[in-house]
Amino acid sequence: MGSIKRVWCISLFLYLILLVGTSIADFVPGSYLTLPQCIAATEASAVYPNDPGWQDAKVGERIRIQRRPVVVTYPINTTQVQWLVQCANSFKRMPDPRNGGHSNIGSSSMDNSVVIDISYMDSVVIDAATQTAVVGGGIRLGPLYIELDKAGFTIISANHPTVGLSGAIASGGFGLQSRKYGVTGDLALEAEVVTADGSVLIANAITNPDLFWALRGGGGGKYGIVTQWKLQLIPIWAKFTVFNIIYFYTGFEEVLTNFWNWAYGSLDDISVSLIFTNNEINIQGHFLGGEKDLHGIVDPTGLFKVGNAKAVKHNDCTHLGSRAYFIDKDKTCDKIYLLNVGTSPFGPNYGDVPTLQTADVTPVTEGVIEGYGAALKQQRENVKTKSMFFAKELSVENITTITELAKTMAYGAHAELTTYGGILETQLTDLTAFPHRNGVAYHLLLEVPLTGNATIDEPALNYINTWEETLRPLSNGGSYVGYEDEDLTNPGLSYFGGNLETLKQIDSKYDPNNVFNAGQSLNQTTPSLTTDKCPFIAGGDPPGRRSTGVKINENSLVYITQILLTIVLLINL
């Protein structure tokens, strides 16, 4: 009988050891000696400076400012995001979230940071009955439009297919038919968020509503990393017309005057922009109606007849075809493959010094959706950008000033005057953190390409600065946070207006140690990484490091107590 008891007790002892080993095998970044060891334990893919592909991994689409993070990671689930944030915290590195990689100032791949690129978190689950979708936080807009279209739905957001959904929502998300439905953030119902300490929170109108408010238009790289969104969907429009009017700079002042006086006050069903380069002007639009109705709206403005206007109209596009229309230089509705940009849509980055990029004709291969072709990899952009909002009032003299600036457009420069108003005019500026609603008539985006050669680039920079100095006083002072500009005197005020102080309070609540500090949006400074105290850990000190990746929790203490009792029992047998 004694031997049976001993066998039973030994078996129980081994079983309890197994339980303890399982229960204390939680991820503990402080148990690893180096950052690479910690990141390897997360099982997320990672690229380091000496690895093949580093030059491509370390930057997104915009390469004017080349940053040097310590590593770029690619999680595929929320747990990995949590662990990566904890690794960065433990080793005094800033966790820097990246979605689409479109930051104008490189804020999604900051120096010495751990970049957490969520672009592989791109799942889409649609509930047709409720017209909602649960979407991975890293998906890009082109693939999202395709997946939603399969079920007969869409959302409101930007035309550019490589833009990330989370980045769009963090910027507000103005896009096609925002005058009818609002911005992308207005369609968000809920977010799953990894916060600064690696915890996961749900944010919606009831749970953590202040965080939910901030995530929609409060700027990227702040508050937390959204790993999943729940979106309200919109049924695909039954009838619509897309159009493009080209003027070749004939009668530009008349075009600008007529456009300015008409577009803002037009029907909510029409989305329209005035675009000008150094060799032509065009008006691009999307109308929720037929061609006859479109003429009834636009003909009284004379915009179809100014100078040598050439109009191209389509009323037979599919929904995806109309999306592709706006990025197709030939203005057709046939190139749906342009939207199918996958998860790695950019061509090569040529080094630490931004250079003039050349086109890449290699098709995208990673993450493309079967049956839709594949977009070509897009060249990365070395551009300088300015953004400003205008109220309705603009004098004849102001129109003339803009006309004269447009006539001297720098080679390759691009300006886009986009119409706001519509439903946005009826919304309070604090509906979400995105404030550019009531009182905003137009948004002006100006971009000039750069080469990386200071001598060659000087005229282009002088030109864009002239626009800034001349037109900023005519604007309402606001700028779109999606087009970050390091030259702004008070970026937080320009991006968020009266919402800035509330955003600071929310940021302090959910990120008291300023862990997510990549962008300039809240006028904050980056904490030192060389201090004796760790600024990323509450209380200042990083977790103690142990040789094994285990953590003793309350359950573990219970199991250990049971083991000790078993040992006592064994001794007394």
Model regions and ranges:
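Soluble FAD-dependent oxygen oxidases
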Residues: G2-C9, L18-R546, K551, L557-Q562
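A periodicity- and composition-biased signal for non-globular, repetitive helical segments
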Residues: S11-L12, V568
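Active-site or pore-adjacent capping/gating segments
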Residues: L565
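C-terminal membrane-anchoring or membrane-association module
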Residues: L569-L573
